[in-house]
Amino acid sequence: MKQDVTVELTGGKKLHFETGRMAKQASGAALVTQGESVVLATAVAAPDPKEGIDFFPLTVDYREYAYAGGRIPGGFIKREGRPSEREILTSRQIDRPIRPLFPEGFRNETQVIALVFSADKENDPDIVGINAASAALALSDIPFAGPVGAVRVGYVNGEYVINPSYAERRDSSINITVVGTMDGIVMIESGSAEVPEEVVLGAIDFGHTEIKKIVAAINELAAKAGKTKRAVTAPEFDEAYFETLKNKIGARLADALDTKAHPKTESYALVKQIKDELAAEIPADENAGAAKKKLAHYYELLREKIFREQVTKDRVRPDRRGFDEIRQITIEVGVLPRTHGSALFTRGETQALVTATLGTNDDSQRLETFEGEQKKRFMLHYNFPPFSVGEVGRMTGVGRREVGHGALAERAISAVLPGEDESPYALRVVSDILESNGSSSMASVCGASLALMDAGIPLKGAVAGVAMGLVKEGDEYAILTDIAGAEDHYGDMDFKVAGTRKGITALQMDIKISGITGQIMREAMEQARRGRMFLLDKMDEILAAPREEKSKHAPQIRTVQIPTDKIRDLIGPGGKTIRGIIEATQVKIDVDDTGRVNIASSDEEGLKKALAMINDLTAVPEVGKTYLGKVVRLAEFGAFVEIFPGTDGLLHISEIAEHRVKEVKDELHEGDQVMVKVLGVEGNRIKLSRKAVIREQRQKLGLPEPGAEAPAAAEGQPRAERAERQPSSNASTITIEGGEDFDDFDEEGGEGEGEDENFNREDTPNSAPGERRPGGAGAAGNRGRRRRRGRGRGPGQGGGGNRGPQ
């Protein structure tokens, strides 16, 4: 029978929970809708416990179907393949908050599946999926100490926003996912733009208020349609056996766990030796297997009890550090000769070799998302080989843990990357963990920051990360800075915080207990801030700022902005032009729709050559700027000068020289190189002047104007013979080839006679309508010689004036 419930969150967004219509054979199923995003989650557990295991076999799978966003999958297969990185990360976000809420000793295989059936471009289905999974478990017969609720909190214009849309998230300085119960927070996942701790804490508190509404709604639905939970028998605790074991080897085991006296590998060997000695004492009979299993279980419980009592009662850590003390730091940069940037970051017995590689825009990762196709230009990959913990293992594909740790470090660094305008590189950072004893993801953050600075990437600030732990027994608790492996394994909290001196860029928190108070959270954040400052000081001692020069092995990128209407000219028909540049210069060229062109090469000469070719192809003449051009054609009224490849301008006869030019061919010839200034640009018409360049050069050299120092005429000499005859200032009749009667030129001395007002560089005088051609051939065909009335002017003032009196 269908049942549903709706909850309205702050801001007006609604979550609708429904059950009883779909997937009715699952132990629990919930269809959850927000906006037009719809997710079905199911929960199923095997009827019987799985034999021979000492852990809870939980599997969580979150899948996003392409049809949910109205897409057909790309590629040849045309169906969904293996999980994407986003699907893996969301699966982990569902798994981490629910796993601690199953009862101890529950060993039945359990599977939670969340399927995205519909996704709009406003509501991210990942939050819907977490809530759907929680509801499915609450409705099922599977024992579960939930439900949990999940929200995303943004911070836009000083206001917190619940479940912000994709557009709002782009304007938000925080992107934080908060999951909790009625009593407290159980998981946090966050990326932020160097925000203060108080802003993050405010977002968590704000989110928890909304979480309580969601939990109440799920409880209401479970009350209507939920199944009776299975009975789970709590594992028996043999107090006598445990005390006997403690009295027998407790002191030896405590000494073996002292990692100040014994390094990690030696400590592990001593712990194993004690256990092997106890196992050897077990009689080899039919009960030996069960006895060894019982020994292993209680031996592990004793290790945990020793650790927790030392921390909460004795107030000491396994390696005898203070609660807020960070292990010894060793840093090297530039450790690899051919990489673009590298750093070796060692913290205690955790070591990360981090490299940075610079690429072009073509190297960016292309993603298909519900928002549409996107490009990701920064990637951080985390590798955890088995030798890092002294073990033997298979080197197969990347595991979920590696994907999750890499994503956390990536978020931490993303906030300080320069904009594409400042640094157009695609960036790939790889962290290879060479040794591990806790906090390897935070070592990756520190190493990544150093490697990028070593590569010359202008980060906004250095980023450091520290992992915090918590051990809580009743009202007693201890917050630990820079937790090691045992403190992570036996502690109650793993709280990773990364950021700069200005604020937090990423954090991740997982809780193994039912929840922590706001006071504990604030203390942990402050302790993490002090630890982060200590690490940043250590990093600054080695490399305080990005290197000014990039590696000689890294590609050099030059960026040029071209007009969007020039993109076609650069690419050419079928890409012929751009391919020709690439082949001639051996560079990489990337052009986007905005006209932004990135040219990349490790060869400086090839880069310069390609840049010059692109500038020539796409240059736009600027009024008032001088260019070196080539005379490509002569005409009666002037010359056509090519100032860029394929771009001609008209050098009118009146603008060729300061003196009167009778014939263009007397001054210029085809193929001549001339300096010209752009007087004006009207559409495709470019007006050029050589006279202006000559005048500027003469004035610069301090030379007089032509004719300014002519000798005085002898007294009595006829006036007409004392100076060069000038054109009459009175109206005169001038004969031209073809055309109609019109003024010689405009008031600014632009075009003169013979220039058609529709001139452009694609047209020629022999083909353009209305242009004057020898023999009287005009736009309408051959015409007789026509006469027009013009206004005579002095030399250099216009086309008519240059022709002189008739």
UniProtKB/Swiss-Prot annotation:
* Cofactors: Mg(2+)
Question: Spans of biased composition, class Acidic residues?
Answer: 738-757
The EC number(s) this enzyme carries: 2.7.7.8
Which InterPro entries does the annotation name? ExoRNase_PH_dom1, ExoRNase_PH_dom2, ExoRNase_PH_dom2_sf, KH_dom, KH_dom_type_1, KH_dom_type_1_sf, NA-bd_OB-fold, PNPase
Reaction equations catalysed: RNA(n+1) + phosphate = RNA(n) + a ribonucleoside 5'-diphosphate
Question: Basic residues compositional bias: what residue ranges?
Answer: 783-792
Identify the SMART domains for this entry: KH, S1
The residues covered by the S1 motif domain are 624-691
Keywords of the record, alphabetical order, are: Cytoplasm, Magnesium, Metal-binding, Nucleotidyltransferase, RNA-binding, Transferase
| Molecular function (Gene Ontology), one example | 3'-5'-RNA exonuclease activity
Question: What sequence ranges are listed for the domain KH?
Answer: 555-614
PROSITE patterns from the xrefs?
KH_TYPE_1 (PS50084), S1 (PS50126)
Is Nucleotidyltransferase among this UniProt entry's keywords?
yes
List where Basic and acidic residues composition bias occurs.
758-774
Which residues fall in a compositionally biased region of kind Low complexity? 704-717
Amino acid composition bias (Gly residues), ranges on this chain: 793-806
Q: Name one GO biological process term.
A: mRNA catabolic process
Q: Where does Mg(2+) bind?
A: 488, 494
Any one GO CC term of this protein is:
cytosol
Region of interest (Disordered), residue spans = 698-806
Q: Where in the cell is it found?
A: Cytoplasm
**Which family, according to UniProt?**
Belongs to the polyribonucleotide nucleotidyltransferase family.
Q: Which PANTHER family match?
A: POLYRIBONUCLEOTIDE NUCLEOTIDYLTRANSFERASE, POLYRIBONUCLEOTIDE NUCLEOTIDYLTRANSFERASE 1, MITOCHONDRIAL
What task does this protein carry out?
Involved in mRNA degradation. Catalyzes the phosphorolysis of single-stranded polyribonucleotides processively in the 3'- to 5'-direction.
- Protein name (record): Polyribonucleotide nucleotidyltransferase
Q: Which organism is it from?
A: Acidobacterium capsulatum (strain ATCC 51196 / DSM 11244 / BCRC 80197 / JCM 7670 / NBRC 15755 / NCIMB 13165 / 161)
> What lineage is this protein's organism placed in?
Bacteria, Pseudomonadati, Acidobacteriota, Terriglobia, Terriglobales
Q: Which gene encodes it?
A: pnp
